[in-house]
Regions:
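Active-site entrance/lid segments in N-terminal catalytic domains of soluble metabolic enzymes
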Residues: 1-193, 205-208
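Structured core elements
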Residues: 4, 82, 178-179, 200, ...
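Electropositive phosphate-/nucleotide-binding environments in soluble metabolic enzymes
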Residues: 16, 20, 40, 63, ...
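Alpha-helix C-terminal capping segments
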Residues: 24-29, 48, 193-194, 223-226, ...
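Short acidic/polar active-site loop segments enriched in Thr and Asp
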Residues: 32, 79, 197, 253, ...
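Extended hydrophobic/aromatic segments used for targeting, binding, or gating
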Residues: 44, 192, 197-234
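Short hydrophobic/aromatic-enriched beta-strand-loop microsegments
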Residues: 52-58, 198-203, 254-258
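Alpha/beta catalytic cores of nucleotide-metabolism and tRNA/nucleoside-modifying enzymes
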Residues: 217-235, 239-309
Length: 309
């Protein structure tokens, strides 16, 4: 299936099974699954699944931390590294600021009220494995207080990251390496020059720079520029099988989604994710049949007609 589960953080916040449920559902559909640096299940455990996986990584100020985390990923058997380049500082997550969200959890008055209204939340929290961040536990000391995701992105990540840093990481990894968050032809060409094997056109679902251009609007020009030199994937805002078909028609090799499977995960765990992936697969197949296409190889720009602006 040309749709995959993009890496998302903190999946056990949505359901106790978290990444375990998503990985199992993706394996059932034979599609790719992304594991986040801020994941709540270890990459070592998730590697037992046979479907393709990528490890999404953030670039830290501490170069020793970067190297140590990459070494652990290699030892776990990770084959594809995905470096996120559009989140070198935290976005303005106003809801998180209002709620006081942090890791480990710190109860606020609002949180206590929510737990009282929904006692099953508290029961699940107390009866399931402790919430943690396995990819960071050995490297980040959170014993002195709560760490918000915004603080992690702003204080620990390196806003001075440059192309030389990325090139050094590509060489150190010495395997399949992709950049997530590419949004221009110039950057796509640079990714090719330094030896990346793939790029993901993404604006982080609009959660970082809310006024950024849609990745779909960038897709055609980037495919025209480097599509024959590097694998191009797209995510952000994908909700329908016809969205996937349009992106594939413009030259994307695959399309990812995050919130698309997170809400079903929250509602029904693995069954919910399987239901979402099943609906997506059915929509893609139905749309292609109605277009007279038997294979994704039949899709091309000829299938699309853009509005004149």
């Amino acid at each position: 299936m040309p749709f995959y589960c993009s890496p998302t953080a903190l999946q056990r916040l949505y359901h106790p099974a978290g990444e375990r449920a998503v990985a199992a559902a993706a394996e059932k559909f034979g599609t790719m699954f992304g594991v986040s640096s801020l994941g709540t299940v270890s990459i070592k455990e998730l590697r037992k699944h046979k479907n393709p996986q990528v490890y999404q990584f953030y670039f830290h100020k501490d170069r020793g931390l970067n190297r140590a985390m990459l070494e652990e990923a290699k030892e776990a058997g990770v084959e594809v590294l995905m470096l996120t380049v559009d989140s070198i500082t935290g976005g303005n997550r106003e809801r998180d600021l209002r709620s006081g969200f942090s890791i480990p959890f710190s109860l606020t008055l609002g949180g206590i009220i929510q737990f009282a209204i929904k006692p099953l939340w508290g029961f699940n929290y107390l009866t399931h494995a402790k919430f943690c961040l396995p990819q960071l536990d050995d490297h980040v000391d959170m014993s002195d207080g709560a760490l918000s995701i915004g603080r992690y992105l702003t204080e620990m990540l390196d806003p001075s990251m440059n192309w030389r840093d990325v090139e050094d990481m590509v060489k150190f990894w010495d395997g399949q390496f992709c950049l997530k968050g590419i949004m221009s032809v110039e950057d796509a060409k640079k990714a090719v020059d330094i030896g990346c094997s793939g790029i993901i056109l993404s604006n982080h679902g609009g959660r970082q720079l809310d006024g950024s251009r849609s990745p779909f609007d960038q897709l055609a020009e980037i495919v025209d520029a480097v599509g024959d030199k590097i694998d191009i994937i797209m995510d952000s805002g994908v909700q329908r099988g016809t969205h996937v078909i349009k992106a594939l028609s413009l030259g994307a090799k695959a399309v990812g989604g995050g919130r698309y499977y997170l809400f079903p995960l929250a509602a029904a765990g693995q069954r919910g994710v399987e239901r979402a992936l099943g609906l997506m697969k059915a929509e893609i197949i139905r749309g292609m049949r109605l277009m007279g296409c038997n294979s994704v190889n039949d899709l091309s720009k000829k299938n699309l007609k853009f509005r004149q602006r």
